[in-house]
Amino acid sequence: MTERRPDLIPAWVDGTLTPVDKLRAHQEGLRHKAVSVFVVRGREILMQRRAMGKYHTPGLWANTCCTHPEWDETAKDCATRRLEEELGITGVSPVYRDTIEYRADVGGGLIEHEVVDLFTGRASPEMTVVPNPDEVM
């Protein structure tokens, strides 16, 4: 089993997908992979507010979960893992919907240039959410 390296994310350097330090990717505005998940229950969408300790966009309201896959991690595995790590959500099977790309200055000298795999998941009426205070408010 490979040791987890959450600091290394897939980013393109000179046209080649390469493991890159997450902070470097944002400082240099490197095009990199990301994952975005929207969990729905009926007509409701679960949103979260980013923790104030996050190194960029703290306190920002966002979708259910947005993150970066680790190097050698599939987008779907990443989505499932981060739902549990950020919100304590299990039993939701993310379904791939589309891929988008965007570039945005997020302040503090950081740039998001993401190729985002979008997922949705259906929540049961009895689903519980246990927010991780290091991740969400």
Q: Locations of the language-model features?
A:
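A generic fold-level signal
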Residues: E3-R4, L30-H32, V40, I111-H113, ...
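Unchanged
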Residues: T67-M137
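Residue-level detector of high-confidence beta-strand sites
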Residues: P19-V20, Q48, R97-T99
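Conserved Nudix-box catalytic region and its N-terminal flanking loop in Nudix hydrolases
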Residues: R24-V35, V40-E85
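Acidic, metal-coordinating catalytic segment for phosphate/diphosphate chemistry
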Residues: T2-S36
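Residue-level signal for well-ordered, solvent-exposed loop/turn and beta-edge residues enriched
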Residues: G15-T16, E44, L60, V95
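Residues that flank catalytic or metal-binding motifs in active/ligand-binding sites
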Residues: D7, K33-V35, C65, Y96, ...
